[in-house]
């Protein structure tokens, strides 16, 4: 699997000591970009059965700052905005997100929150076009 973002994500990753090991942590925007590529490659764009898209949905569900983090990433903003704009046009997207947030206390609220964050990223296309 070839990712156009992997090498850059690794270069810009941070090192964290876990026990007696050092692990590399990529930023949330790079994690999303890598998951988007995996979703479209091995997940074949199947929103409902893709574990990569489930990971994306979970990140958008649980990370309040994700939109701001992506907006701040000059390198990834346009790429991710375009992808999410296209995803929002797919009718099965809402069903997939709904399935991924079913374990939450208020699944409908979480679904709306995730979709709202997807829309906010898609709306960054305007910002990316002006950058």
Identify what each model region corresponds to.
Residues 1-131:
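Compositionally biased terminal segments of proteins
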């Amino acid at each position: 699997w070839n990712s156009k973002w992997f090498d850059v994500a690794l270069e810009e990753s941070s090192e964290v000591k876990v026990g007696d090991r050092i692990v590399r942590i990529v930023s949330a925007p790079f994690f999303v970009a890598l998951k988007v590529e995996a979703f479209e490659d091995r997940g074949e764009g199947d929103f409902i059965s893709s574990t990569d898209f489930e990971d994306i949905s979970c990140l958008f569900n649980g990370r309040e700052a994700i939109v701001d983090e992506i907006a701040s990433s000059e390198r990834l903003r346009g790429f991710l905005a375009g992808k999410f704009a296209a995803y929002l046009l797919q009718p099965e997207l809402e069903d997939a997100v709904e399935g991924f947030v079913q374990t939450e206390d208020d699944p409908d609220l979480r679904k709306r929150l995730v979709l709202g964050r997807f829309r906010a990223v898609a709306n960054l296309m305007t910002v990316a076009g002006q950058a």
